[in-house]
């Protein structure tokens, strides 16, 4: 692939020189600027272009500071070059300040005007948006540029690649607007980008097929950097389908070819360690962090990695440091803020029991939700629910999830976001585990109100609302389920969902059609992945924690049974007769006790009655002398 996707944007500068010639142009321009030339704006622009062609962006920034007086006076004439420098150096504040100064209108207004002079600015803006995670804006700009290329200002292949790049991360954007550029299998760049989309939607076999074609094309042209990039993506997709041996073989081969301190090598090392099952008790995390070369990783930023790559690397490092009991400081990311609170609440992440951790986080998260559901509340909530599920405290997990939704929907249902959708997914699963159909009905009713308030904006999260539609169907509410799924099918302009179409259609589904729908499902593989078959509530394991409500019901039932036993005991008894006040004393110690005549009292019982014969037997003074044996002793003769 090309080093950047801005080919022909800077072609208007009319500089097509070698590396040494670019350096000579740079030196000549600097001398002219120092001597005070007549047209400093044009000379300074040529100087910036020569430095950009050499990929010396820090040096370009140095010249912007050195010749600030020229920048202040003629800055609008080389605004494109300045934006490109800020984009490559990952300077978002400077980039946004300059961009808003150039384009004062909102994006939709600018795209409607279709100003030809802003085409280069929009290209750089789209690249910046993709690199910083603004995928929706990047996709919108790329689609506009691709659909307004009648004069062939840009390469059609590059526009096709650029349009597909945001979809590799945010595939749901295709639901709002289909692709405007066709697929051309002659370009391995386009095959590579298309494989990302296939992998994102779970079509891994198709992704592998496209990657193998792209790898063959890159090998034929001999671009080693592109070959390594395609191999890395191929190893990832092979790992996703369970072909770990092939994936490891590719990664090990890449590590042998690449330099140890290169960013590409560090990504391969991270992916190879993803196959290892770490233990928070036995793993030496200090050694692992050193092997991953985390210090070197932290020297890179978005200049080297994309937004998604950089986020994944930082998340992995945060997890390793958390289980290494290293202090984690709260930063911009949701995960770092969550781990910061978690490490403060828990004394020792690796040694403290999950039960204690779940109890601490449950009380803390409850207070946090009551004070507000915005910010990083969703992070600490998900961590709390995970710990509660590990300890099988299902009711507490349900209770805290419902509290989050109730507080979020306290004022209105209009502010529905991804955090609420995630909690709804979790609650549906927990309701299924506990068999709480009534609670599921209440949640579905609230989601119906949310759907009304959204006023047709459900296309922003079609997978979630499709899930809600099938949950309605499982509860027997076929009318609302069909209405929701019919609305979803109108938004789905891409691949048709056969199952949704069957539910929406009024035709009945016979046995043969049902068999065709499930013919390709691998049951054994689903069971291996942890999917449990449907079973009745009577067969479910009852070894679950008893909630407070269930405990109260059990106590009330015991109390009723006790009352019935007492009523049965009192039948045929004189209730007016008072109980014996000495009933707590032993029988022989009571004043009413009278022993039988022939019964001999116990000799060692304190306070026991004793007859006369027994007393005489114990009187030592009346005993006679012991009898003496008067028979002489026979003396045995000894042996001589």
Curated annotation (Swiss-Prot):
One of its GO terms (molecular function) is 7S RNA binding. One of its GO terms (cellular component) is nucleolus. It is found in: Cytoplasm; Endoplasmic reticulum membrane; Nucleus, Nucleolus. TPR repeats lie at residues 188-221. It comes from Saccharomyces cerevisiae (strain ATCC 204508 / S288c) (Baker's yeast). It holds the Pfam family SRP72. The gene is SRP72. PANTHER family: SIGNAL RECOGNITION PARTICLE 72, SIGNAL RECOGNITION PARTICLE SUBUNIT SRP72. Residues 574-640 are annotated as: Disordered. GO terms for biological process: SRP-dependent cotranslational protein targeting to membrane; SRP-dependent cotranslational protein targeting to membrane, signal sequence recognition. This is Signal recognition particle subunit SRP72. The keyword Cytoplasm applies. Belongs to the SRP72 family.
């Amino acid at each position: 692939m090309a080093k950047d996707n801005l080919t022909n944007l800077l072609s208007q500068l009319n500089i097509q020189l070698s590396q040494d010639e670019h350096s000579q142009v740079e030196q000549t321009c600097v001398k002219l600027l120092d001597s005070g030339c007549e047209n400093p704006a044009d000379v300074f622009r040529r100087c910036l272009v020569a430095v950009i062609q050499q990929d010396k962006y820090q040096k370009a920034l140095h010249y912007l500071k050195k010749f600030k007086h020229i920048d202040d006076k003629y800055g609008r004439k080389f605004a494109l070059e300045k934006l490109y420098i800020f984009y490559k150096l990952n300077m978002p504040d400077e980039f946004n300040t300059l961009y808003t100064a150039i384009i004062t209108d909102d994006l939709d207004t600018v795209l409607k005007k279709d100003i030809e002079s802003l085409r280069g600015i929009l290209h750089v803006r789209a690249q910046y948006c993709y690199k910083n995670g603004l995928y929706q804006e990047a996709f919108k700009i790329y689609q506009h540029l691709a659909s307004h290329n009648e004069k062939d200002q840009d390469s059609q292949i590059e526009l096709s690649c650029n349009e597909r790049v945001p979809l590799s991360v945010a595939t749901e954007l295709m639901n709002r607007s289909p692709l405007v550029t066709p697929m051309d299998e002659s370009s391995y760049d386009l095959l590579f980008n298309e494989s990302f989309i296939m992998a994102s939607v779970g079509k891994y076999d198709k992704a592998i097929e496209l990657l193998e074609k792209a790898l063959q094309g890159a090998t034929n042209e001999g671009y080693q950097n592109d070959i390594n990039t395609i191999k890395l993506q191929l190893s990832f997709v092979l790992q996703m389908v369970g072909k770990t041996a092939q994936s490891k073989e590719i990664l090990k081969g890449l590590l042998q070819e690449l330099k140890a301190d290169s960013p590409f090598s560090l990504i391969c090392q991270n992916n190879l360690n993803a196959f290892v099952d770490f233990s928070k008790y036995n793993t030496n995390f200090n050694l692992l962090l050193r092997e991953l070369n985390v210090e070197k990783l932290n020297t890179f930023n978005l200049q080297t990695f994309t937004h998604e790559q950089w986020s994944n690397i930082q998340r992995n490092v945060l997890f390793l440091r958390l289980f290494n009991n290293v202090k984690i400081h709260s930063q911009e990311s949701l995960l770092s803020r969550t781990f910061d609170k978690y490490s403060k609440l828990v004394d020792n992440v690796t040694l403290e029991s999950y039960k204690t951790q779940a109890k601490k986080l449950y009380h803390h998260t409850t207070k946090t939700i009551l004070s507000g559901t915005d910010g990083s509340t969703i992070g600490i909530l998900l961590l709390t629910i995970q710990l509660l599920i590990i300890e099988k405290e299902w009711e507490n997990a349900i209770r805290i999830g419902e509290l989050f939704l109730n507080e979020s929907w306290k004022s209105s249902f209009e502010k529905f976001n991804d955090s609420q959708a995630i909690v709804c997914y979790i609650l549906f699963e927990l309701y299924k585990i506990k068999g709480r159909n009534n609670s599921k009905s209440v949640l579905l009713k609230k989601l119906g109100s949310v759907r009304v308030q959204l006023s047709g904006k459900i296309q922003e999260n079609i997978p979630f609302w499709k899930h809600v539609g099938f949950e309605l169907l499982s509860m027997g509410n076929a009318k609302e389920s069909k209405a929701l799924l019919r609305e979803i099918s109108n938004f789905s302009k891409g691949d048709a969902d056969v199952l949704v179409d069957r539910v929406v259609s009024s035709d009945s589904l016979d046995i043969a059609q049902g068999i065709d729908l499930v013919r390709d499902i691998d049951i054994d593989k689903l069971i291996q992945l942890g999917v449990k078959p449907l079973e009745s509530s009577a067969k479910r394991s009852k070894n679950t924690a008893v909630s407070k409500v269930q405990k109260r019901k059990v106590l009330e039932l015991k109390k009723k049974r006790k009352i019935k036993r007492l009523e049965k005991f009192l039948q045929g008894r004189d209730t007016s007769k008072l109980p014996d006040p000495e009933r707590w004393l032993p029988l022989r110690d009571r004043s009413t006790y009278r022993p039988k005549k022939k019964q001999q009292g116990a000799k060692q019982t304190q306070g026991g009655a004793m007859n006369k014969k027994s007393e005489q037997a114990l009187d030592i003074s009346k005993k006679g002398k012991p009898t003496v044996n008067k028979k002489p002793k026979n003396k045995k003769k000894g042996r001589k």
